[in-house]
Amino acid sequence: TGLSKGLSIFSINVNGLNCPLKRHRLADWIQKLKPDICCIQESHLTLKDKYRLKVKGWSSIFQANGKQKKAGIAILFADAIGFKPTKIRKDKDGHFIFVKGNTQYDEISIINIYAPNHNAPQFIRETLTDMSNLISSTSIVVGDFNTPLAVLDRSSKKKLSKEILDLNSTIQHLDLTDIYRTFHPNKTEYTFFSSAHGTYSKIDHILGHKSNLSKFKKIEIIPCIFSDHHGIKVELNNNRNLHTHTKTWKLNNLMLKDTWVIDEIKKEITKFLEQNNNQDTNYQNLWDTAKAVLRGKFIALQAFLKKTEREEVNNLMGHLKQLEKEEHSNPKPSRRKEITKIRAELNEIENKRIIQQINKSKSWFFEKINKIDKPLANLTRKKRVKSLISSIRNGNDEITTDPSEIQKILNEYYKKLYSHKYENLKEIDQYLEACHLPRLSQKEVEMLNRPISSSEIASTIQNLPKKKSPGPDGFTSEFYQTFKEELVPILLNLFQNIEKEGILPNTFYEANITLIPKPGKDPTRKENYRPISLMNIDAKILNKILTNRIQQHIKKIIHHDQVGFIPGSQGWFNIRKSINVIQHINKLKNKDHMILSIDAEKAFDNIQHPFMIRTLKKIGIEGTFLKLIEAIYSKPTANIILNGVKLKSFPLRSGTRQGCPLSPLLFNIVMEVLAIAIREEKAIKGIHIGSEEIKLSLFADDMIVYLENTRDSTTKLLEVIKEYSNVSGYKINTHKSVAFIYTNNNQAEKTVKDSIPFTVVPKKMKYLGVYLTKDVKDLYKENYETLRKEIAEDVNKWKNIPCSWLGRINIVKMSILPKAIYNFNAIPIKAPLSYFKDLEKIILHFIWNQKKPQIAKTLLSNKNKAGGITLPDLRLYYKSIVIKTAWYWHKNREVDVWNRIENQEMDPATYHYLIFDKPIKNIQWGKDSLFNKWCWVNWLAICRRLKLDPHLSPLTKIDSHWIKDLNLRHETIKILEESAGKTLEGISLGEYFMRRTPQAIEAVSKIHYWDLIKLKSFCTAKNIVSKASRQPSEWEKIFAGYTSDKGLITRIHRELKHINKKRTRDPISGWARDLKRNFSKEDRHTIYKHMKKSSSSLIIREMQIKTTLRYHLTPVRVAHITKSPNQRCWRGCGGKGTLLHCWWECPLIRSFWKDVWRILRDLKIDLPFDPIIPLLGLYPEDQKSQYNKDICTRMFIAAQFIIAKSWKKPKCPSTHEWTSKLWYMYTMEYYAALKKDGDFTSFMFTWMELEHILLSKVSQ
């Protein structure tokens, strides 16, 4: 109900929760009733079963369970009330529990009791007396007392016994009272029917303190079908003056899978446009009205579907209530019989519904479990911090828990933060007039201003991310994708009107802000929350179109010092740049330098809109594009959603809009003004390395400044930032900004420290997720060793997660590999082999759960041989990252400053001529080279292993030293590049020199005679032809063929994997020996493919992978390991326990397989009785039918499961268990197919024939 309406408490005796179906029904019931506190009695759960009780939205669960499956009670607190316990007391036998604590509004204590059937009044009296010191005015006692408290509590109207009277006396002495009798002194309503005595009674009670009676608002008995008791629910008034919890509508995407709903909405869209789209209607208002109409239609459709679904249940429940009412006043055996019948009907309906829900949920896990998907991610990620804010510090630095005051404090804080608007337009213009900003050309501006097209809208809708929270209007991305054909023309007209008028629909300005606590920060301080904003999807579509346009020209506007949100730029560029600068400073004899990491105060939120708009004008943006951005920032508003309450909206007069795809680029453009000011200010001395002066590195608002002549440069830097801040709104936290200081002595360092307002750190600072160290020799320790420690801690946290070894491999790929790649990418320094061996050991221990591996790691590293599952080799990824620097050398891009400044001894131009070019004599790498020398060593080693010449290749550039050293004219090289391409491959070496293409033949006549002779002599030389007149290898293509670094690591890693193949025992060869057969190359391919394609579910495919890879231990293998002479079959047949024997030859197993083949014959499938078919998926060549293969594969894998389950048991696997497993697979695939368009036909085709046989077997 939520505390806005008061606190609701619900109590129910559930009569056992060991059945999963019962637990699901209870959870479903709680979610429908939505009590704030739910008290459960007689759960029959034991101490070890406490994790079985879970209800989404009620995660604070306190239980008292005994050692046996008797008694057992629990109290569940809704997440919405933010309950924090202060005192808990439990009964070791599970008969009572006391929990005291605070909700976000009030203190409360609950005593939940389940009295035993024998001497119940005495037990209650003793329990309450024993806890009398804990009972206060805030206490509420609930539970199944197993005794009435008043004469009216029994249908027999029998007098109360002495024990009950004594109990009532104790209750009165403790100032407690029966709340139900206080509200209904003369009413006869019961919670339990005793079939043995044929009587009704109210033995479930809620007691409250007399001093607090005014808080109790309502109490009622709630009929319950799944238990033999009815529930009892009480509502308490909330005396605090609170805002009502906001009910925000959000489209249920499941409705979009219903074709009837889709058709109805399409009709509604057409009808709305026919009635309202006319010249008198403003199109912006038309669109907002359309959304309101469609929202109403969705609500009506959902209500209709819900009513239709529950109609039968509601009719039966109404009839049941009427019969029970009549039965209370005038009992009749016939009526009792009808009541029992209706309850049974209701139970059957509800059970079917819950089973369907369970199967849908199971089928989702069936498809996704152990894969790189949501279930695994949920298992490994940290528990999400609850965003409930129950206390905050006020202006006097005192903590307040008053909800109204919390709401006021936070709303005022964010209103002030976003409403700080500068009006100094003249100062802004003067400041920007003095800035030398780059400008877009007229043609580029025209491209920005071209009319929005329907194809742009359709493409943007298609690429919207799915399963994301919608904005205030509640319409999701899936809504726009489902009705794309209908909505694109409407949005096109809307956007065209916006382009003409410069006015957005009102809903485009709206946003909801949710506050998320910053990790590791004091949650009682208002500034320690991160505001997350949600805009409406239609506004995002428009903004994304604008983003796509400006992104094409952003590199012309933004300097390569900025790498955040810039296409083709990566964060590690600036990390490498910073490390190279640090290394350079450390080499200097005279030091007066500083590396400063500037912390901006809410940088995105403080940017002033007038400054941003004028900056856009300064870089040449004008016309329609500028008009649209001005419209977006003309009057945006936001509402904070705080603990479910929507606070009063306020205008956003500063800051880029959160959740808007355009915001990062606009912010970068605004930040570029400051970056240019710093670069152009000569008094701010940067670090000089060779011909480069390095001053800045930026990733959005993360800024590092490199300074020489520290005191004077810092003074001027602060002046420049202050001037910028005065017009832009940008502010820095000087105390949070950290710096490395480099001086010649301690006295000089102290002088610098005293003169700057920043925090000086002695050893390290964190930047973009890695540690920069003051001395580069500490990089390995602070990053590589830290990474190893983090991985070890992570796998230790995950050691008990419920997933198989395949799931653990995927966890490594999903959670460990990205982290490792990021660290290696940022800092690819030399690391010892022992480091990777340690990582491998940690990972293998995790995968096999501290047990001995049952499959060789070399086998698991081969994707094709491991059923599509690959165990990542971190050392190979590391090598790939180290080598990839060579690609950047070959491309010689101007933006790669990070690469050129590493080594002062080497001419930066040299790097361009290292790859596939004439050898350079005496390369001066320098003994301290961190990255490039290590890359070069590894690059050469791989080329040698591939038997490739690292200096000459078909992809050697025409402007290489090989050609330039021929002293050709510049015009000749230009002609060659225009006619034959950029590489030697286009020239055609040897006898076909310049004769392969018409363009080449034509070019010959243009080349100077002596140049042609020199060129021909070079291109026909035997040593050149032998090395370069061939098809380029994949390795050569990686570095010289691809123009983008996207996927570069993957491509290099793929080649390195191919080179580093390690020999291991081939499981297929093992099967060949056992089966005394030879498998051809095609057979092996079929077996490997069968492992990968046998099922869409990894839990099913895992069985086939295990079988093919010879995973299971056998008596022969165990005897070899333990050096025991006993190799006999564990099933007791006396045979030698080889793998083939355990799977096929054992008489008990053979009998089972014959039963399987009998079913095959029933399906009219004729297959030879051969183990290679069920165990390896190698079907006879004449078995062409894919249907037969699909259904047989499912049957055989189910059989493998049953055999593996009884692996060491001396019995024949059960055919009943096999059919049950098949039925489970059928059910899971059925629900999975229902969710996917087009899959159900395939499902029916596969299972149609087998379904009839399964039904007959299961029913037996």
UniProtKB/Swiss-Prot annotation:
The EC number(s) this enzyme carries: 2.7.7.49
CDD domains with a match to the protein in the record: L1-EN (cd09076), RT_nLTR_like (cd01650)
Highest taxon listed in the record's lineage: Eukaryota
Keyword field: Magnesium, Metal-binding, Nucleotidyltransferase, RNA-directed DNA polymerase, Transferase
Domain DUF1725 positions: 1242-1260
Nucleotidyltransferase found in the keyword field: yes
Group of enzyme by EC: transferase
Catalytic activity: DNA(n) + a 2'-deoxyribonucleoside 5'-triphosphate = DNA(n+1) + diphosphate
Gene Ontology molecular function, alphabetical: metal ion binding; RNA-directed DNA polymerase activity
Domain Reverse transcriptase as annotated: residue spans: 497-772
Binding sites annotated in the UniProt record for Mg(2+): D599, D701, D702
InterPro entries: DNA/RNA_pol_sf, Endo/exonu/phosph_ase_sf, Endo/exonuclease/phosphatase, RT_dom
Gene3D superfamilies the UniProt entry points to: Endonuclease/exonuclease/phosphatase
Other facts: This sequence was constructed from an alignment of six sequences, determined by these authors but not shown, belonging to the LINE-1 family.
Protein name, per record: LINE-1 reverse transcriptase homolog
Species per Swiss-Prot/TrEMBL record: Nycticebus coucang
